[in-house]
Amino acid sequence: MARVKRAVNAHKKRRVILERAAGYRGQRSRLYRKAKEQVTHSLVYAYRDRRAKKGEFRRLWIQRINAAARANGLTYNRLIQGLSLAGVQVDRRILAELAVHEPATFASLVQTAKTALPANTSAPKVAANA
């Protein structure tokens, strides 16, 4: 049986790791062991942060909606409650886009939410010391 030499596979394995580590600083892009550790960590970070990105965007959308809703005399939670009672099914991403790029359309949605809310609960509560 022929003897199997592993130099080709070893060089390919090292080359792939060093190609993935291109752009890293210092030894992490030049030395195989350091590059392998950094590439492994980078893949872990990428996996984790692809999932974290969803929550970050949701928080950003909520902040934008809240700011625009308060400018129209309603708080975020009252706006969402009013839209739910009115039967408007618009997700937070679209609401945030409307708040930024289409303020008139967003204002009409706020008015729809205000009319759907029960009486005397549509005004936001203002802090006493503000």
From Swiss-Prot:
GO cellular component: ribonucleoprotein complex; ribosome
Record InterPro entries: Ribosomal_bL20 (IPR005813), RIBOSOMAL_L20_CS (IPR049946), Ribosomal_protein_bL20_C (IPR035566)
A GO molecular-function descriptor: structural constituent of ribosome
SUPFAM superfamilies: Ribosomal protein L20 (SSF74731)
Pfam families, sorted: Ribosomal_L20
Domain of life: Bacteria
Biological processes per GO annotation: ribosomal large subunit assembly; translation
Keywords (A to Z) from UniProt: Ribonucleoprotein, Ribosomal protein, RNA-binding, rRNA-binding
Family annotation (NCBIfam families): rplT_bact
Record function comment: Binds directly to 23S ribosomal RNA and is necessary for the in vitro assembly process of the 50S ribosomal subunit. It is not involved in the protein synthesizing functions of that subunit.
The family this protein is said to belong to: Belongs to the bacterial ribosomal protein bL20 family.
Protein name: Large ribosomal subunit protein bL20
Gene it is expressed from: rplT
